[in-house]
Amino acid sequence: MSGQHQITEQSSRNPLSRVSTLLPEKPLSPTSTYAGTQKHPEAPRQSSFLIQLQNIRNAIRKPMAEFFGVALLIIFGAGSACQVVLSTNPDVASSARGSFLSINFGWAIGIAMGVWVSGGISGGHINPAITIAMATYRGFPWRKVPSYILAQVLGGVVGAGLVYANYIHAIDIFEGGHHIRTQATASLFATYALPYMTQASCFFSEFLATAVLSMMVFALTDKRNHSPTNGLLPFALFILFVGLGASLGMETAYALNPARDFGPRLFLAMAGYGKALFNYRSQYWLWAPIIAPVLGAQAGGLLYDTFLNDGDNSPIKWRCASSQEHQLAEVV
């Protein structure tokens, strides 16, 4: 009895002994509780649902980066065009807000911001012509090209829609009425050539400017050349676009990017601008701001890889082999 009394007294003095009497003797199963009931059946479903959402996010993350990159490009570029042109109407603003150079800076800032947003995620193509050129010369997977281009075009649609919504009252005043929509304001979003330009001249202007753009993109991303660090690449593209706008931008409004023209043009069609968007100059929308930039980007990439690229990241391998033989000859 005295031994039993000592055990009872020690148990009463040790608080852990009381806690231990509350714990179950056997380990709990993952779906059981202390009361022996099941967990809420929705818990596994919620976990599975979150995993599915994460998988979807991972699958669309790169195309979404392209989407937001192009949307930003249009917001800055078309937004600057709207501000400069619409402000020339005295009923919209007391004085003009900018010049053609302001529009050049707007598009240049747009390309820089778009690449900063998307560059570390998707590569920052934000241009179907560049995406196709990267697939041709830099091993970008062709299976990803359709999703990138779709995202880029949709980004152009949404970006144009946001700018249009922001300036809709100024557009109404500029056009002279809510239901009046003409090329005068359509040209703030989509590209149109100057009246004296021939079809061949329009094509050549877009081809040339995009070839320069593509060659510079390949140079700026060539680690064997004096390429900037990844964080400074958008700034280099900013300088490039200011130069392109200042030198080759007047005649066709320098699309250089199928998504930059076709996306906003699709939005304008939905906004009531009519068939003239696509009938202009015998389907100008197709051969000038789409086909010419795609071919120009191919030409720029071909020229860079043929004459300047010395690496093994191009399908044009003979330049690399020739350079290695030359270096070996110098050593010997």
UniProtKB/Swiss-Prot annotation:
It is a multi-pass membrane protein. Residues 1-66, 122-144, 221-230, 305-332 are cytoplasmic. Residues 1-20 have a biased composition (Polar residues). Residues 88-100, 166-199, 252-283 are extracellular. The keyword Transmembrane applies. The keyword Membrane applies. A motif (NPA 1) lies at residues 127-129. It holds the Pfam family MIP. The chain crosses the membrane at residues 67-87, 101-121, 145-165, 200-220, 231-251, 284-304. GO terms for molecular function: glycerol channel activity; water channel activity. It catalyses: H2O(in) = H2O(out); NH4(+)(in) = NH4(+)(out). It is found in: Membrane. Its main location: membrane. A motif (NPA 2) lies at residues 257-259. Induction: Expression is induced 4-fold during ectomycorrhiza formation. Expression is highest at 15 degrees Celsius and decreases at any other temperature. Residues 1-45 are annotated as: Disordered. One of its GO terms (cellular component) is plasma membrane. InterPro entries: Aquaporin-like (IPR023271), MIP (IPR000425), MIP/Aquaporin (IPR050363), MIP_CS (IPR022357). Keywords: Membrane, Repeat, Transmembrane, Transmembrane helix, Transport. Aquaporins contain two tandem repeats each containing three membrane-spanning domains and a pore-forming loop with the signature motif Asn-Pro-Ala (NPA). Water channel required to facilitate the transport of water across membranes. Acts as the most efficient Laccaria water channel. In addition to water, also shows strong ammonium transport activity. May be involved in fungal nitrogen (ammonium) support of the plant host in symbiosis. PANTHER family: AQUAPORIN OR AQUAGLYCEROPORIN RELATED, AQUAPORIN-9. Belongs to the MIP/aquaporin (TC 1.A.8) family. This is Aquaporin Lacbi1:317173. It comes from Laccaria bicolor (strain S238N-H82 / ATCC MYA-4686) (Bicoloured deceiver).
